[in-house]
Amino acid sequence: MHGAGEQQQRYRYNARSDEQHHHPSTSSHQYQQQGARQMHQMHPIQATLMCTPTTTSAAASTSSSGGSNSSGGSGGHRQQGNILRIGNSIKIGDNILEPAGTLVFSQADGTPWTGQRIVVNGSTHAVVKANLFPIGTTPPVLNMQSNQNWYMNQPSGTVPMSSNAPATTSSATPDSGIQSVPTSPPSPSYAMMNDVDIGDHDDEEDDDGPADFTDMPLLKPVDEDDDCYDVPCTSEGPPPNNSNPAITTIPSSCSTPAPPKESLPTGMNVEEWGSFLIASNMDREEIVRRLMAHDPEMAKAIAMRIRELSAEESKKKKDMEAEVSSTTPTTPRARGTRTRNKCATRSTNSPDVTTSNLPEEPSTSTMGLVKENEDVEKVEGKRRGRKPKKRRGFHKESFEDLESDAKKSKAEQHEDHLPEASCSSRPESVIPPPVDPIQFRLKVREMMERKLEQLTQKMSEDMTELRLSHLTSSKMVNGERGKRRESFLRQLNEQSKKLRKGGMLGRKRLRMFMTESDILEENKDNIKKEVKEESTPPPTKLRGRLPSRRTREPSEIVNPEPVEKKFNGEYFEITKSVPSSDDIIPLWMAPSLTCGCTKGACTSDMDCLNRALRVQCSSDCSVPYCSNRRFWKEDCGNKLCVSNGPRSKRVLKTKIARRAGEFLCEYAGEVITREQAQEKFAQDRDPRIIAIAAHLFVDATKRSNIARFIKHSCKPNSRLEVWSVNGFYRAGVFALSDLNPNAEITVDKSDLLPFDMACNCGATECKRVIRGVRWRCADPNEKIVTRRFVIRNRRKTIERSSHSGLPAILQTPMDENSSIRLKMKQVLAAFAFRVRKIDGSMSRTMLPHYTLIIKFLKTKGNNPNPVEFVSLFRKWLEAIDDDDLERAFVAIESHYMSSSILSSSLQSKKAKDNAPRARALSTSCPSPVPSKRGDADLSYLESLYPIGSYDPDDAWESYSTNKKGNAVRCICGALDEEGTMVQCDTCHFWLHVDCCQYVVRSNEKAQKSKNPPSDDGEYICDFCTNKQNGLRPSADVKLTEQPDVRFENCDYYRSLINRRGIQVVLNETVYVNRVLPEDHKAMLRNLREEKKGSKQKDTNKYRFPKAATSPLPIEKVDRKNARIFRVERLFVCPGNNRFVFGSFYAWPHETYADAGRVFSKKEVFATPYYETLPLDEVIGRCLVLDTATWCKGRPKVPKFKEDDVFLCEMQIGKTQRVFEKVPPKNRYPINTNSYVFTEFTHPKKVVRDFRPYDPSNPSPKPPKTSSIPSTSSIDPPQSSSDGLPEVDTKKLSKRHIQRVLKRLVKNGSRRS
């Protein structure tokens, strides 16, 4: 095979004559006449046209000779005057190469066959070659292949040259010296042409004039189909060549010859076989009649089997269409489908593109050509280096489908006026219609949605394994984690359902191509679905988190329609506030700010500027897991409920427990102006109209959510806050304290209503009146005649009163070159906005501090001192005494005033102060500058009772109880009442069962011999059996349940005793040495961590040294040389080496705070510094309490001196600059029952008047609680602004009232 460069072009014989076009009934009538003589139906035969490169001279000589025979055959002759040209020639140098192609002949009905045939016998490898020339008289040589026989066919002179395909339909490879090899022989199912009498046809004779080609079939490429191919035509084959005895005669396909008697079924003769025979051209009724006449039961079984096979084939076809991955539909080419003609080149492998969709008609030659076409494509694929394409099989349909398709085909044939009369007697077979591009795209879309759903489900499973959450704490209850996981999976399932419902768009597009009956059926289904949905309550929907974040933009502010009527039309349900008109939107808009956070999740008010100013972060926040987006949590329906009852007694309650500071819901309604609020409130006196700004109100009377049922209380458990969300002001309800399930939510509506209203809340501190918004707006129509110099100020006041919300100065861009004064103004504006009320007013107690800072900025010029500025704010914050505002100021100060500004001013000031000291030191011997700790005043740590001077456990000797008492005295030394406890029948103290079981188990033999238990079940503790050292606890108690994560080969204890005789108990505080040894770190480095149930692969080869057992003396240590340590774990490693693990507490002088900060001498601060120390480093015991317990009383046992009892309310960070309150989970409460705790007659007060770095300058007005930290360590300002003048608020208010009265008197006199 000479493979390279060979090309083959397929052609098809088309029964296309003028008679058929102009007189379609002629061929039908002729066919009916010939049907009486039992016309033979011929199957198309494949013919291969071979070509070889020839020289120009040879072409010329051959064309001029005119009468040469074919080079590969015998017994035939050439006709010089009739040339059939197929394609265009290609000239390569001196050679002319004609393209090779495959011809498919199908003789039309009634068309005579006049060609001559030359038969060549031989093997399947026989090749007949011929030279074709672009111009000449040499006819083409056709090499036809059928049943291992090879023929050479010469067409008659009636074949027109105009019937050739256009030049674009054929192609050849410009490669000389290449010979084409015919395709493989067709399958044996292909029938040969029958011997037909030529004389039966009306042949037209040639004359000397131009040839008449009207009765000849046209030669047309397969790729260029025409409308005439819609109806296949049967034809008779040409007369056989009598000179070739190898040709066998086969009857027509319309009549099947009787088989021999031996091949008939048992019990059937030839007559019965003829009556039962079913031919392909029989009528349906005839087939059914024969089946029913033979065996009715068998006919029914055959019909059922046909239906089953049809259903299976249809299902396979749908599955095959659904799994198509290409975006362009590749359908089997059918008759009546126009395709683009493309040159078959080596690089052309793209499928045909369907441009129009016509009904596909059955063909008598389709099934016979499928196999050979596959063989041709396999050969082509091997030559081109690609795999052959798979073809789909043809499916059978049921009788009902056959009838419907037959009717459709008849109707289409009648409409198109196609010459189908000649084919009326053939059976109708059904071929699957071509794939519609729209349906194909819909199928691809459905397949992509299924894939997307699978990927989403897989991604959700992977994400749940990662355990991503906004919470940074790893201590999460398993039940809570399971609930969150279920909620997350539920949200993903709902999102996947929405994706599946996305096919509605495809159905809408498909409606354009629906018929009226399809639309009516779809409407009926929709009506049924709506009826079903109305009969069942709608399920609760969980909204997805990620989509709701990204889709909430300011452009969403529209006036939506009411969602649903609630409580019999009492109000319309909406999810968020909406404007009442378009005129409200400009007044409602709020400026947007950027928090500038680069790490974390915007969770702290001390770090995030937006959270400090009550601004919700937008989607442009630089932090990837920003949690400052409270208002997108629209879960009011899941965590809140409205109690049933009359209209006036409905209240809003919680379904589950809520924590302090948690967002509960949004107070939604219509946003209206002040005038509209006054009009509505005057009519209804409804307290649901709430102010969100000086001139804006939210009306929750007609359109709102369940927040409208929140009641007023003078002692509320929640509060209303106004936040800037996506550029608009929205009101939210936040919890003030921890709320239990089924707790009523109440807020204080003072200064929020349009007018005053009577209060009947029933609280113990009820004010009896709910104050309305105070209107401090001047009348713009007021005329000022006499005092003209204040007209400008009056107008400015009127203009400022109309503005509310975030100050515009906060939007000024900041850079390093900005002036310090501008930054200070921004700090003042931001903090003033934070301390103002919702209506824009400021408390009278804050006005003196506010005016003092404004005066400072005006008098100090362009470069005011930042240290003095910060100190003024410190005094203001001490007067406010609000932890939320303190944290907000830290965030505002750190954002607008960087620490570099403060540090630079501080260094310049210290340089001036230390200049004389430096000169004095330079004259004498050089000495180092005293450290900060050395500069601090440590006299507050001095005491008459140093550490180790007394034993707190001495109080156990006098501690007693009675039989009915609940006092606890356990060998572990702990006083908590957790777990199961047992009471001693001798001393009547209660003990922990876990602790006692360990001691009983370890001393089982001693107890059996000395004091066995009585038969009555009495229990006698170790204190009564003298196993303890007196009446004080002194034992090592091991934990019954070891921790899950622990060191290898280590045991963990509840209490341990060191060599000094001090019993160290879990969760208690002790003193440790300030200077610690380093020897124990080698053992700690060789300890390997393990989890419960896991095994180490290799053993630990490190040998732990044995611990010393000699007792250590108790030393007296000053407190300034010791540190306070919180015990969190006690363990013993191999060699009886005992260790304690915990965290340190910091003294006030160990924190980095400014000199203006005041402390309490009994105050310590929790730190994040953890350490593992030897147990022998514990030198004493102390007690650290929370503020409430410290003020309440002291424990009876162990009894500490007052110098060893401390309070802890704040904790500091690693930098020791940021102070915040200790969270509840890090607090360590003690037993405050009366049997072990003594309360004070008058509770103590925390006095903060101590400054460790400036003892000579105490605070003029000590606040009640601790103040906030500063971002840097600064010295006290030395300026006249330190002393804040005392302001008598009573006198100030009296003066203000007098001025108001005078103004009213003047206005009244003018009007009169």
Swiss-Prot record:
It catalyses: L-lysyl-[histone] + S-adenosyl-L-methionine = N(6)-methyl-L-lysyl-[histone] + S-adenosyl-L-homocysteine + H(+). Pfam families: BAH, PHD, SET. It is an enzyme of class 2 (transferase). Residues 383-394 have a biased composition (Basic residues). Its main location: nucleus. Residues 590-635 form the AWS domain. Residues 200-210 have a biased composition (Acidic residues). One of its GO terms (cellular component) is chromatin. Residues 312-321, 371-382, 395-419, 524-535 have a biased composition (Basic and acidic residues). Residues 69-78 have a biased composition (Gly residues). GO terms for molecular function: chromatin binding; histone H3K36 methyltransferase activity; zinc ion binding. CDD domains: BAH_polybromo. Belongs to the class V-like SAM-binding methyltransferase superfamily. Histone-lysine methyltransferase family. SET2 subfamily. This is Probable histone-lysine N-methyltransferase lin-59. It comes from Caenorhabditis elegans. The gene is lin-59.
